[in-house]
A protein has these predicted regions:
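N-terminal FAD cofactor-binding segment of flavoenzymes
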Residues: 91, 104-157
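C-terminal auxiliary extensions adjacent to catalytic cores
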Residues: 435-492
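N-terminal Rossmann-like FAD-binding beta1-loop-alpha1 element of flavoenzymes
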Residues: 67-101
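Iron-sulfur cluster-binding cysteine motifs and their immediate structural context
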Residues: 6-23, 37-54
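FAD/FMN-dependent oxidoreductases across multiple families
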Residues: 205, 312-392, 396, 401, ...
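Active-site-proximal substrate-binding core of FAD-dependent oxidoreductases
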Residues: 395-444
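Predominantly flavin-linked oxidoreductase catalytic cores and closely associated redox partners
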Residues: 105-107, 191-333
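Short beta-strand to alpha-helix junction loop
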Residues: 170-191, 240, 312-317
Length: 492
């Protein structure tokens, strides 16, 4: 640490400081949301946020899981024990490959996911089948018990300014699920171990090991070198290790995003569902662009996605202050939670940082591949699609072992998972999430006036034909209004 203070400027909770002897200190550890922003921006790689810090009620969740000794060499090393990384581990291990997973978090009980626990899947990624207590992805020959699923969703919507909102009903044939993100990852970890994968928690990978241009393993934070034929980077949206492998991740950064979630215990009597809320925000500065969310699943979650053109935190108060203010004052939140919020028990504060970037299908180099959220924009792949991505990648890696060829050309078939339909849908999803950024409140109001009859669950769970027919009907009915507002028409 050289005392530059970059970490202080980026912290959305405003809990960091630099001492006179040029050392970073955490002044209020209990409020850390573990977004790892301080690590991400440190020019000297001097910051290591070892554990996800949670309120005292969940101190047991940050106990370090005991693991076996690390071997000198594996067939496959996976970095990151999220859905995509564990999908790779499951697929490789059941094919008989000696597979290790290195995860920086302390144990499998903490997922670090900030989203609302909604299960959905992009076209071409997988098909969810649930029957008799079993969760299945038939295309990927994957089954496990569905104990992580909390309930079927009863509503899913987009709330706009002025009381406008999209139709939230699940139409016939459409089913959405609310899940426990922690249980989902926990079960995947158990499944990977059942097939023979070796999981190492509280183990941080510092960089990759090279012989010439080929990746030949990893170097851990303590300097331990571990060899492998293939390294799989599944290190999430910031993709720190992917960059060190020189896998080409599009560097275009349209926006920096800070995403924080306050997670509460769920009381009885609430209906399961999720809403994004656009416009009508409490900020005095109308240039602030944010997207609050409220979700009711295994927990009650109130979140905010803050967009910025700079990597630094720009609001005048900590980000959890603004989320709590939205939770207490926004009528849209009260509509879903009633008077429960004042009595809810806070379980965790979780956060992450994203960079919006264009999709990249070039996710392989000699000896390494990237999977999961590090090749998409804004962490939009979701739990199930990420798992499917990992399962698919594992099968392709088995073929590379059969060829005994770990060159970029041999490993590049991993990118065949990314279909044209998937790319199109992800781009459309990102565009809709950027509406609060590109539209002022007046334009948003007009947008919702025109499109509030749209059925929001159809966007997630409908067929391409259902989505197209719905949108064409709405646009035909409102063609003159759209022509009168060219900004909306052009953006659509």
């Amino acid at each position: 640490c050289n005392g530059c203070g970059t970490c202080v400027k980026v912290c959305p909770q405003m809990i960091l400081a630099v001492t006179e002897d040029k050392k970073m200190v955490v002044e209020d550890p209990g409020r850390c949301m573990s977004c790892y922003g301080c690590e991400d921006v440190c020019p000297r790689d001097a910051v290591f946020n070892k554990k996800a810090l949670l309120p005292d009620t969940r101190l047991e969740d940050i106990e370090t899981e005991q693991t076996r000794p690390i071997e000198e060499e594996y067939d496959v090393i996976v970095v990151g024990a999220g859905p995509s990384g564990l999908g790779v581990a499951i697929s490789c291990a059941r094919e008989g490959l000696n597979t290790a997973v290195f995860e920086r978090l302390p144990n499998r009980r903490v997922s670090h996911h900030t989203d609302g626990g909604v299960l959905f899947v992009f076209p071409g990624a997988a098909t969810i089948k649930r029957e008799g207590g079993v969760f299945e992805l038939p295309e990927h020959n994957f089954k496990m018990t569905d104990g992580f699923i909390h309930s079927e969703m009863e509503w899913l919507t987009l709330d706009g300014p002025g009381g406008y909102r999209f139709d939230d009903r699940f139409l016939k044939g459409m089913t959405g699920y609310c899940c426990s993100k922690d249980k989902f990852v926990h079960q995947l970890a158990d499944e990977a171990e059942k097939h023979g994968a070796k999981l190492y928690y509280d183990t941080r990978v510092k960089t990759v090991k090279r012989e010439g241009e080929r990746i030949t393993g990893v170097i851990l934070l303590d300097g331990t070198e571990v060899r492998s034929n293939v390294v799989v980077t599944a290190d999430g949206v910031l993709a720190r290790l992917s960059k060190k492998t020189k896998i080409i991740l599009n560097s275009k950064s349209d926006a920096h995003v800070q995403y924080v979630t306050l997670e509460y215990k769920r009381p009885e009597g609430l209906k399961s569902g999720f809403s994004f809320m656009m416009g009508d925000l409490p900020f005095e500065d109308d240039t602030v662009k944010a997207l609050p969310c409220v979700g009711i699943g295994s927990h009650v979650e109130v979140s905010m996605i803050l967009h910025s053109k700079t990597k630094f935190y720009t609001l005048n108060k900590p980000i959890d202050y603004w989320v709590k203010k939205i939770a207490k004052t926004d009528k849209r939140v009260k509509k879903y939670l009633g008077d429960h919020l004042d009595s809810l028990e806070l379980v965790a504060v979780k956060g992450t940082r994203l960079r919006l970037r264009e999709l990249s299908r070039d996710n392989a180099v000699d000896g390494a591949v990237a999977v999961g959220d590090n090749w998409v924009a804004g962490a939009q792949l979701g739990n199930v699609s990420s798992l499917a991505n990992g399962l698919f990648a594992g099968k392709e890696l088995k073929k590379a072992f059969e060829r005994n060829d770990f060159s970029k050309g041999s490993l590049s078939s991993v990118s065949d998972f990314i279909t044209k339909d998937m790319v199109k849908t992800i781009k459309q999803t990102e565009k809709s999430m950027l509406y609060p950024v590109v539209m002022d409140n007046q334009t948003l109001l007009k947008y919702f006036e025109i499109f509030s009859s749209a059925n929001y669950p159809t966007f997630f769970y409908g067929t391409k034909m259902q989505i197209s027919m719905m949108m064409m009907g709405i646009m035909a009915k409102n063609i003159f209004k759209l022509l009168a507002y060219p900004k909306i028409f052009k953006y659509l």
